[in-house]
Amino acid sequence: MSEPLKPRIDFAEPLKEEPTSAFKAQQTFSEAESRTFAPAAIDERPEDEGVAEAAVDAALRPKRSLWRKMVMGGLALFGASVVGQGLQWTMNAWQTQDWVALGGCAAGALIIGAGVGSVVTEWRRLWRLRQRAHERDEARELLHSHSVGKGRAFCEKLAQQAGIDQSHPALQRWYAAIHETQNDREVVGLYAHLVQPVLDAQARREISRFAAESTLMIAVSPLALVDMAFIAWRNLRLINRIATLYGIELGYYSRLRLFRLVLLNIAFAGASELVREVGMDWMSQDLAARLSTRAAQGIGAGLLTARLGIKAMELCRPLPWIDNDKPRLGDFRRQLIGQLKETLQKSKSSPEK
């Protein structure tokens, strides 16, 4: 049997057209625009370390505030007044042939000259530190640049500042690897992979040595005051040593401020990182039960010294970290624990003999 025909259905709305994707208009760039093109830099810094990193950056980057300018202006006027008064006293002493007063003026001139020299030296170190921060920003821009011509001169300047001789094997390999067709990003990248690791390896060795000394000193010393003085002195030496390796000098005030702020940030903002880095090894190997309280304090002091060295290393480097080459506390943790265990075993075996 045939089925009956269905009635007609009328639709009031028209048929909907299929949506078509809208294409953007084609954009063409000239050769000059393509050379100056640079992608936006992405900040890959972890959010949990933002406060600590910003505080330590402020310690190394000198600030320019209105109060500082006013103080500097007042000191300049005071210095000019002292110089003018000294010249007047010298002229009067010479005219009256007052040799005692003339000798006092000469001694005062020597003291003022020494003070001016110290101020100039401190200003020069602060200026050099500020230039290092600018160089790191410039290197970050070159690592994202496709232009040609600036990378080689920039890297040669960095090598000269670091005291790397032209005949150094790493620098010779870099010269052999670069050619005229490479852009600044490739040239600076090759320098970061061939030459910069030479200085980084020296800085890592210094951090390991100072951290090991701090660990052993705290572990074997019974005097807390001596421990504090030793750690403070060695950490200041570590900062100076790392800065010297990278070709810069830290000023007196910036060095002390860096040391204070880094310790504060390590003790508070960096506590979570220390627990994350060290907690697993301590729990897995049951080191908390094997080591004494002084030994545990020694490991903590060594890790604090290592973190201080890593931060000083980061802010004294002329290049930013790339390809996850930043040293971590885990790189020094096992070494410190191994050295401490060897020292404790030797100290236990020596009385038995």
From Swiss-Prot:
Gene Ontology cellular-component terms listed: plasma membrane
Q: Which keywords accompany this UniProt record?
A: Cell inner membrane, Cell membrane, Membrane, Transmembrane, Transmembrane helix
Which InterPro entries has this protein been placed in?
Answer: DUF697, UPF0283
Q: How does it sit in the membrane?
A: Multi-pass membrane protein
- According to the record, the residues making up region (Disordered) are 1-35
**Bias (Basic and acidic residues) ranges:** 1-19
Give the top-rank taxon of the lineage listed in the UniProt record for this protein. Bacteria
Query: Subcellular location, in the record's words?
Result: Cell inner membrane
Per the record, the major location class is membrane
Record-annotated membrane-spanning stretches: 70-90, 100-120, 213-233
So what family is this one in? Belongs to the UPF0283 family.
HAMAP family in UniProt: UPF0283
Q: Which NCBIfam families match?
A: hyp_HI0043
State the name under which the record lists this protein: UPF0283 membrane protein YcjF
Q: Which organism is it from?
A: Salmonella choleraesuis (strain SC-B67)
Task: Name the lineage.
Answer: Bacteria, Pseudomonadati, Pseudomonadota, Gammaproteobacteria, Enterobacterales
Q: Which gene encodes it?
A: ycjF
